[in-house]
């Protein structure tokens, strides 16, 4: 028995079992994978839950990883919510969304009940809802009540944003259609039962009519026999014995009378049964007429239901159009707001564009100012590129020379080893030659000492001694040569083994190098490429660090340069003011000198034009006039201005040259030449 808590779940499960599905759907474990639910949704609304969507549901998730089941259930729940919102125009904001994780992991009946409730709503609102509603009405009354309660809960939890008119019409339609179908089905069953009863009563009536005719025939036969018996004087029985005349009080008369009474009683009973059957048939005919009238009324109500359904469809379409119009109105409102925002943004952008035009004009003026420096920068760039190319060539030449030097060193070492081996062989040969020389001297001295004694000895002994000495000499010479040859052979063998080892190592190295160069092993190549990439990344990091340092230095120096340029501009303005004052003073001095003595004025004009207002050294005079003092003060003032300008230029050169790279120093403008240098030129 199902518990009251999960009564609705079991009712929904019984309804779900009535569906014709390929996947198993008899219990909670079989529904936990979502395959049966997806197939049911595809059966309800194939235009929304398409076969492509059904193919995304993985069928082999039962009893395996619960995460696969959870992914299937997520897809099913999301598609159901989309169907309610997009197709049915339902908003399920207040309806508790089923927890698919609990269904997939623990087969929670409460969460599965919510999911089945949503699937039931899809079934009773699809295009073929009439067939599914009839299947629901074929269930037990308790199950029907639970299913209706589930539909009412689903309807009551709709969000207030959805139109209440459409929802009420849909719910009334579902209830009216359910009640109409229920009443029609009950009346159909009653009509079938009454028709069956009428058929049975007709059969009974026919049987009774047959019995009545048979009884009437038997009665006629009996009456004929009675009349025959009455007219006949004697009768013979079955055994051939005469029964005697039929008279009152006789045995035969009594028997016939008894049989006649029995037949009358049976006839009365059959007539009573016939009357009863007639009454029943009449009652059933009246009931049948009432049923027919009720069926006609139900047909009229079903026609009214269909008209109401058509009206509901029209209202639903109008509601959909109203929603579409409201959505379009909202979109137009949003577009209007966006249009106002865009207007504001356009105004802001126009203001910014005006500012940018002014900035662009300023930048063009600055570009015209710095056009001269660009040529110098390009020249310096070209020189730097040439120097880099020369540096690359020199580095490649240096690498080649280092490689040649290593080869020559290896050749030198090989020659040195060969030289050492040859020197050793020479020393060994010298020792052998010295030994041979010593052996020859000893043999010659022995022969000279024995010549005197051989003359006194007999010939046989002399011959024997000579023969023995010759053999001894030959043996000594052979032994000495063999030792020398053995030493030479050993040295040659050692040298040969050493050369073989060197050849072996060289061949192994050649094979390893050739294998390394011609190897197609991707792991080796990946290692080599990895090493090269690491080296390049390290170089790149170093270059980026150097570049960042250079950028920071350039930014700081740019700030300093801008400050110094502002200071320099202020100084130049001051110098121009001082120059104007100086010229005024000089003109006043000239006017004063002209007023005093025109000859001195002409001489002073010539000296000022030739040497730019420098003080002309003259012979010492006994007394200094006022004009001379004024000229000296003006010259001293001019000298101070020039000295100050030179000091500023030297400070600028020091600041611009310190802490900068070669390119940064070349980019800076050269300091102005002093007035004294210009004058000297």
From Swiss-Prot:
Gene3D superfamilies: Calponin-like domain. It holds the Pfam family HOOK. InterPro entries: CH_dom, CH_dom_sf, Hook_C, HOOK_N. It is found in: Cytoplasm, Cytoskeleton; Endosome; Synapse. Transmembrane segments: none annotated. SUPFAM superfamilies: Hook domain. GO terms for molecular function: dynein light intermediate chain binding; microtubule binding; small GTPase binding. The keyword Metal-binding does not apply. Keywords: Coiled coil, Cytoplasm, Cytoskeleton, Developmental protein, Endocytosis, Endosome, Microtubule, Synapse. The keyword Cytoplasm applies. Involved in endocytic trafficking by stabilizing organelles of the endocytic pathway. Probably acts as a cytoskeletal linker protein required to tether endosome vesicles to the cytoskeleton. Involved in modulation of endocytosis at stages required for down-regulation of membrane proteins that control synapse size. Not involved in synaptic vesicle recycling. Required in R7 cells for boss endocytosis into multivesicular bodies (MVBs). Has a role in regulating adult longevity. This is Protein hook. The lineage of its organism: Eukaryota, Metazoa, Ecdysozoa, Arthropoda, Hexapoda. The gene is hook.
